[in-house]
Amino acid sequence: GLVPPHMAGRDAARIAILLPFSSENAGARAESLRLLRAAELALFERAGSNLLLIPKDTQGTADGARAAAMAAFEDGADMIIGPLFGQVARRANIPVIAFSTDTSTAGNGVYLLSFPPELEVARVVEYASRQGVQRYAYLGPQSRYGMAVNTALRDNAGLTGAQLTAEAFYTGDVEAMASASSRLARGVFEPITPEEALVLRQSEWVPHPDAPFQAVMLPEGSTRLRTLGPLLISQAVDPLVVRFLGTGLWNDEDLLREPALHGGWFAGPDRASHERFEQSYEAAYGSRASNIASLGYDALALAAHLEGGELGFSREAIENSEGFLGIDGLFRFSSSGVIERGLAIYEVQSRGFREIEPAPLTFDPLAY
């Protein structure tokens, strides 16, 4: 492959980044550019002069991803970052840092630098259970994402000695969401009086001992979430009584305008660190970073860290049990390629997301 003149004659570490730069989907093209720019920012801020970043276009197709990976191998890539969707061919001793949330694509040298919803659910359920929640409910889409959240909710509730006692799925529009909200509530919740509401607002929330469920998981974001909250209230499922829980889809400041979501909890990365990254990105490029652009930065920063270490790009180095500190906080990879993240707990309030429990600064030792 070509080497810039200033790197001629050096034994440079080659990092290929595979993204759908020419995808038919305009959103994917825009996200690819943001991820590449974030990686270039990390190259400037974190890497030495011995790292070469090589962009490859996957075109947003499986065939394109395979061709891009083969081209990266032929260019002598020491590590591959990407793709954004799906998976690429694996080659011995060349690690892949992919952005997929589909854990079935991980392993055998493929590591997922992403935000799997299972992690977010595990963290918020662990926190809610410590606050006394014993009975959980699920209200969400019957999609691959929704089913992953539902399974994680059931599993993690069980780990804390709690139960998933009610669930309702929907596919489609507001009418389907309203019908599911009604099925979930089953008419067993009594509307609270204005006097009761005043008392509840002035006191610390505790799980209601007689409620059929004390917390409900709503794995939606944006407009659909702003619709779902009021639909539950219309069924007398009041957030003053039942705690609303979310996933990383809640990490969107547009949601602050919806009073039905105030008081809700979700798990997410350290916001202070992410905001510093957003400021650096905007200063460098004059445009805003997306929520996942930081993954491009952390992937390249990880490559720079590995390149400077004694173990290089080996699995042993990538699977360091102490983990790495990135833009989105602490993370580490298991031997199966799945990511573990240190996440904070946030409460939705009218003026912003309030951190109610910080992200951990260190990981517990891995159990073997």
Give, region by region, the residue ranges found by the protein language model:
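Extracytosolic ligand-binding ectodomains
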Residues: 1-368
